[in-house]
Structure formats: structure tokens, C-alpha cells
Amino acid sequence: LHASYRRQRQMCIRDRAADIFHLKVDIAFGGMDQRKAHMYMRDVADRNKWTKATCIHTPMISGLKGRRGGRMEVFDHKMSKSDPANAIILHDSAKSLSKKLRKAYLDQNDADSPVYEIARHIIIPTLGELKVTPKPEFGEPTTWSDVDKLAKAVIEGEVHPFDLKMGVAEGLSSVLAPLRSHFDDNPQKLQKMLEITGK
């Protein structure tokens, strides 16, 4: 089984490299899980004196369910549209984001928990800060531009994990608002995209 899995992974890497050559891609963009395929592509290009695509790799965001459920490959817990409940979909409504983040896995001591990752890689770089607003009887709103300090505040009880999740949901909703507006104004484009992705 292990050898079969390894062969399958190798085939997948070769297929992705072949796609880059076939499509004459100038810039190959993907998560860090695509690095092996991209480096293989560049090695093949060197050996054959073919044009090499420039490769850009982004951080991986964990699925909302986190890494629970036993031993996993390093990228097997990544967010993927194949499980919509485990992922943020670009046209998710504010209500859907709130529902998903409410259920999202959060290990207060793990900086790689998906809630922290979304704050670190999406919300704070885009909006400049993350706002956490508890119910009035539980305190005043706070803003955060440093995820490590935010995580420390959660561990020490200054920020409640639920309030953090709802703050992340609201921040994501703000980040995705222009996309939602675009698809609201152009529903045929959303329909076309859904037909292509099969979702």
C-alpha cells in the first residue's frame, strides 16, 4: 500500500509538471504543497533546455477541522473545496462564514490552528488589524495586528476563543465582500465557475 501511494504521488507530480509545459505557463502559482511538482518541472526543463516557469508558493491554510484525527502528511490537513464545510469558499455569505468559524477547530496553544492562520495570512495583511468584539457585558472591543500577542491573550483568558472565532468570521466577511458583491452583480459568472469546479 505504501509503495502504491508513493507511485501515485510521483505520477501526480509528473502530471502537474507536464501540465505546466503543455499550457506554456510563465508563472506557476500554488501552495507549498506544489513545491515538489514545481521543482521537478524546473529540473526537467534544465535537462531538456526548455523554458522554465517562475514558481510562486504561498503559505498553506489548514482546513477548518484542523489536524484532528490522527497522523497526517504535512499537507493532508490543508483547506480544500472538496469538503466545503472544512473550507472558506470565496463567495461564502457572512452567515455561512459565521457558522463555519463557530465550528472551526482552535487549539489555543497551537499557532497553526486554522483560526490563527486565517488571521495571520489573510485578515491582518489585508485589513491591517483584526477586531474582536465580545458581548458588552464581557468587555470592550479590542484590535490586534500581531497574532502571537493575540494568541497569548487567548491563552491568558483576556480574549475568549468564541469571540476570536467571531472576529475572524467578521474579518473574513469584510475581506470577501468585494467578491460577493461582484458575484451578486454577475450571477452568470458564479454559475459558470460552479459548472467548471463541479461544486
Q: Where are the model-predicted features located?
A:
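Single conserved hydrophobic/aromatic residue that forms the stacking wall/gate
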Residues: 1-9, 13
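Short, flexible active-site loop motifs that bind/organize anionic cofactors or intermediates
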Residues: 2, 27, 87
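Short glycine- and Lys/Arg-enriched binding-loop motifs that mark or flank ligand-binding interfaces
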Residues: 5, 26-27, 72
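Conserved nucleotide- and phosphate/pyrophosphate-binding catalytic cores
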Residues: 17, 23, 35-199
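Glycine-rich ThDP/TPP pyrophosphate-binding loop and its adjacent helix/strand module
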Residues: 29-35
